[in-house]
UniProtKB/Swiss-Prot annotation:
Family: Belongs to the UPF0285 family.
Alphabetical list of HAMAP family matching this protein: UPF0285
Origin: domain of life: Archaea
NCBIfam families to which the protein is assigned, alphabetical: methan_mark_12 (TIGR03281)
Name the record gives this protein: UPF0285 protein MmarC7_1666
Signal peptide: none
Taxon lineage: Archaea, Methanobacteriati, Methanobacteriota, Methanomada group, Methanococci
InterPro entries: ATPase_NBD, Methan_mark_12
Species this protein is from: Methanococcus maripaludis (strain C7 / ATCC BAA-1331)
Amino acid sequence: MIVVGIDHGTSGITACVMENKTVKSIFKMKRTEINENSFLKELEKHVNLNDIDLMGVCYSMGDGIDKITDIKKVENRGVINLEGIGKKVGGGTKVYDEIKSSNIPAVVIPGLHKGVKSMDERFNALFSHIASPEKISICYNAYKTFGFENFILSDISSNTVTLLIKNGKIFGGFDACVGAVGILHGPIDLELIRNIDSKKITANEAFSKAGVVKITDSYKGVEDTKFEIMSNYKKDKKCTLAVDSLVLSVSMEINSLMFLNHDKNVVLAGSIGTWKNPNISEMIKENIDGNVLVLDGDSGAVGSAMIAEDILNGKREILGISVDF
């Protein structure tokens, strides 16, 4: 059995080829590279396309579907629209359309939004959207890897999304625009609200630079800013403050869910959550009274492949989310 998992992230696309529960290869394409090259031609270097049994696809916010759905049944790529979601480059759209046109069997993973009824109704009442599709994939990877039925997952990268899993189902959480900051994205505060109202900046532009990048002079574009800030942690006072502030912010978000997390299991993921120098997970552990573990690697792409594999093996529910395939 051969499956492929797709993670549509802020800086690009990551794909995982898995055969019989074993990861065979992982490759990445920056969004700018995708605009100039065929994703499927790149994938073909790693696997015969005719041998793929199923692909698990993440795309954008996933707010137009509420089930893990056969790509043939999905309209408008599974989104309501592409507004208000951060910087748009177009690479993910090109990859999605290539996959759909190829007739390779595929399922599209939804985001977590108020239409997903398996979550606690209070979170759906509070927030219109909680997470994009790859966060479900990361959660499922953590669920399968560590075997926890109850845990908090915090994915820290360009943005930070923190989710609570109870009894093997996603209970709720905090989206990138609520609560903790990431490197690029974060919640909109009073100053940004004023700038939006005075038409100095759009709400989407404000969100896209409301992360700790606002503390530094280090914006190097969507793909390279995190490396600029993290590599200068010990050299630049603004970068030091930015990273320390991110750690504080994420720790606050995790701790805000701990009263619902009686097993006290916490899993950190994402390029910043797994960053070794400075060691972000160790810095966060100092602020958390619990069992803090790290999910290394390309957890979103691997998790998408795990979802595809388990669907082929007959699963009709993933972390409480129904499967329509």
